[in-house]
C-alpha cells in the first residue's frame, strides 16, 4: 500500500498536505508515465503551473504557502534578512515567522497535526503532536519532537537534506545515490506516522527533488549524461 492509499483513511474529515519541493508541472505533464499518481490527480481533479511568491526564494515561499499571507506579513523575505533598524543580518527560522501557520490554526481549533520536514520551522513546535523541522535545521536530534520521533529518526538514519557538496562533484553518482536513500527514508517515516498518529492535519514535504533539480535539471533539459537518472529518480 502506497502513501497516497494510506492517506485516504476512513470517512473522518481530515486534510493531508504533501509537498514535492521543486517539482516542475511541465516535468509531470511531459512524462505522465513517470508520474502516474500525480497525472491521475491532475486529470481527475486539477493541476497546473503556479507563480511563486515575491521574492521567489524558498525561505520566503514556505512561510507564505503554510500561512496564506505574503512576506510582508510573515516577516521572512529570504535566506538572509536584516535586523530592523540596522544592517545586521540573520538567517530566518521558524520562530521568526510572524504569521499563523496552518497547523497552528488546526491546534487552536482543538485538532491534531503531524508536521514533517517543512522548511523554515526550526525549532520544532511543542504545540503540535509531532514535528520534525526541515531545511536549515542543524540536525535531526535538535529538529525533532517528541522523543519517540527523535529516537526513530536517529535510528533509521533519516536525513534532513542531501549533502549538497556531493552535487558539485563532476561525478554525480554518489549524490544521486544519497538522494535516493534520503527520499526512501522520508517516505518510510511519512508512512509510519500517517498510520501511527491520530491526525486531523498531516503536512509532509519531500525536499530531495529540489536538490536533484538544482544539480541535474540542465542534464534533463539538454539531454546530458544524467537525464535518465533524473527520470529514474522520480
Place the predicted regions along the sequence by residue:
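Short Gly/Pro-enriched turn/cap motifs at secondary-structure boundaries
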Residues: 53-54, 93
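His/Asp/Glu-rich, glycine-adjacent segments
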Residues: 70-227
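Active-site-proximal N-terminal segment of extracellular/periplasmic enzymes that hydrolyze or transfer
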Residues: 1-49, 56
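Glycine-rich loop at the start of a catalytic domain that most often binds anionic cofactors/ligands
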Residues: 60-70
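Generic recognition of stable, solvent-exposed alpha-helical segments in well-folded globular domains
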Residues: 18, 23, 33-36, 60, ...
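Acidic/polar loop patches that form or flank catalytic/metal-binding clefts of enzymes
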Residues: 48-51, 73
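Beta-strand elements within well-structured catalytic alpha/beta cores of enzymes
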Residues: 12-28, 41, 65, 106, ...
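A short acidic, glycine-rich active-site loop
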Residues: 227-234
Amino acid at each position: 500500500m502506497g502513501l497516497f492509499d494510506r492517506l485516504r483513511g476512513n470517512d473522518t474529515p481530515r486534510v493531508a498536505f504533501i509537498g514535492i519541493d521543486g517539482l516542475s508541472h511541465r516535468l509531470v505533464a511531459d512524462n505522465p508515465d513517470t508520474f502516474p499518481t500525480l497525472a491521475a490527480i491532475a486529470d481527475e481533479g486539477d493541476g497546473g503551473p503556479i507563480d511563486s511568491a515575491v521574492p521567489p526564494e524558498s525561505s520566503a515561499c514556505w512561510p507564505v504557502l503554510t500561512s496564506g499571507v505574503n512576506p510582508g506579513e510573515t516577516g521572512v523575505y529570504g535566506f538572509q534578512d536584516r535586523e530592523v533598524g540596522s544592517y545586521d543580518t540573520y538567517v530566518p527560522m521558524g520562530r521568526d515567522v510572524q504569521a499563523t501557520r496552518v497547523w497552528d490554526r488546526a491546534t487552536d481549533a482543538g485538532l491534531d497535526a503531524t508536521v514533517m520536514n517543512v522548511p523554515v520551522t526550526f525549532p520544532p513546535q511543542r504545540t503540535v503532536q509531532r514535528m520534525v523541522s526541515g531545511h536549515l535545521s542543524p540536525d535531526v536530534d535538535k529538529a525533532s519532537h517528541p522523543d519517540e520521533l527523535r529516537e526513530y529518526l536517529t535510528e533509521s538514519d533519516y536525513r534532513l537534506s542531501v549533502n549538497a557538496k556531493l552535487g558539485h562533484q563532476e561525478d554525480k553518482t554518489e549524490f544521486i545515490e544519497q538522494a535516493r536513500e534520503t527520499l526512501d527514508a522520508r517516505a518510510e517515516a511519512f508512512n509510519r506516522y500517517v498510520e501511527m498518529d491520530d491526525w486531523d492535519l498531516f503536512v509532509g514535504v519531500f525536499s530531495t527533488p529540489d536538490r536533484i533539480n538544482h544539480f541535474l535539471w540542465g542534464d534533463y533539459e539538454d539531454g546530458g549524461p544524467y537525464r535518465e537518472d533524473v527520470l529514474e529518480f522520480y
